[in-house]
């Protein structure tokens, strides 16, 4: 379930409102954690077990016992790769339609599974917490990520409402 990926339309709309410098900050800081796929997904599931319950292959299982499994690593990689794709598009107005399309695809694939806006928001919160703990989250970096997430989530939620 690309549900998490979802959230990560994250930097998606960031292209529309981020300055080049802000987009570069998001990309630079993401590059320092994007290879920690398993740790990112683990942090999300640990903080919000209701999100984990949306994944049939993980629902009802002990998180610590599945963290090192191939299935967990594979799914974590899918989610982080989606986020990386969205983030790579940030910073250029020409990429806004592509980001909007990714947000729409995420909404279209997750809404029928019962994934709520609240759960997307939980994912965002867990991701933000993870980022703050693992990168240099100074004022400008926090502002850039907040703006990227705010804009992306506006696109995602708009797509969920349509």
UniProtKB/Swiss-Prot annotation:
<feature type="binding site" description="distal binding residue">
    <location>
        <position position="75"/>
    </location>
    <ligand>
        <name>heme b</name>
    </ligand>
</feature>
<dbReference type="GO" id="GO:0046872">
    <property type="term" value="F:metal ion binding"/>
</dbReference>
<dbReference type="InterPro" id="IPR044399">
    <property type="entry name" value="Mb-like_M"/>
</dbReference>
<feature type="signal peptide">
    <location>
        <begin position="1"/>
        <end position="15"/>
    </location>
</feature>
<dbReference type="GO" id="GO:0005576">
    <property type="term" value="C:extracellular region"/>
</dbReference>
<dbReference type="GO" id="GO:0019825">
    <property type="term" value="F:oxygen binding"/>
</dbReference>
<comment type="subunit">
    <text>Homodimer.</text>
</comment>
<keyword id="KW-0561">Oxygen transport</keyword>
<dbReference type="GO" id="GO:0020037">
    <property type="term" value="F:heme binding"/>
</dbReference>
<dbReference type="Pfam" id="PF00042">
    <property type="entry name" value="Globin"/>
</dbReference>
<comment type="similarity">
    <text>Belongs to the globin family.</text>
</comment>
<keyword id="KW-0813">Transport</keyword>
<keyword id="KW-0479">Metal-binding</keyword>
<dbReference type="InterPro" id="IPR009050">
    <property type="entry name" value="Globin-like_sf"/>
</dbReference>
<dbReference type="InterPro" id="IPR000971">
    <property type="entry name" value="Globin"/>
</dbReference>
<keyword id="KW-0732">Signal</keyword>
<dbReference type="InterPro" id="IPR012292">
    <property type="entry name" value="Globin/Proto"/>
</dbReference>
<dbReference type="InterPro" id="IPR002336">
    <property type="entry name" value="Erythrocruorin"/>
</dbReference>
<protein>
    <recommendedName>
        <fullName>Globin CTT-VI</fullName>
    </recommendedName>
</protein>
<feature type="domain" description="Globin">
    <location>
        <begin position="17"/>
        <end position="161"/>
    </location>
</feature>
<feature type="binding site" description="proximal binding residue">
    <location>
        <position position="110"/>
    </location>
    <ligand>
        <name>heme b</name>
    </ligand>
</feature>
<keyword id="KW-0349">Heme</keyword>
<keyword id="KW-0408">Iron</keyword>
<dbReference type="GO" id="GO:0005344">
    <property type="term" value="F:oxygen carrier activity"/>
</dbReference>
<dbReference type="GO" id="GO:0005833">
    <property type="term" value="C:hemoglobin complex"/>
</dbReference>
């Amino acid at each position: 379930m690309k549900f998490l990926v979802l959230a990560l339309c994250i930097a998606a709309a960031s292209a529309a409102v981020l300055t080049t410098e802000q987009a570069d900050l998001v990309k630079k800081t993401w590059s320092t954690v994007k290879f920690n796929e398993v740790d990112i997904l683990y942090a999300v599931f640990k903080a919000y077990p209701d999100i984990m319950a949306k994944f049939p292959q993980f629902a009802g299982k002990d998180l610590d016992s599945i963290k090192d499994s191939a299935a967990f690593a594979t799914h974590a990689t899918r989610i982080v790769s989606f986020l990386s794709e969205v983030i790579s598009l940030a910073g250029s107005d020409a990429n806004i339609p592509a980001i909007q399309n990714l947000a729409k695809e995420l909404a279209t694939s997750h809404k029928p599974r019962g994934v709520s806006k609240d759960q997307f928001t939980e994912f965002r919160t867990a991701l933000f917490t993870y980022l703050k703990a693992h990168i240099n989250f100074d004022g400008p970096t926090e502002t850039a990520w907040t703006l990227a997430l705010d804009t992306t989530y506006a696109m995602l939620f708009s797509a969920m409402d349509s």
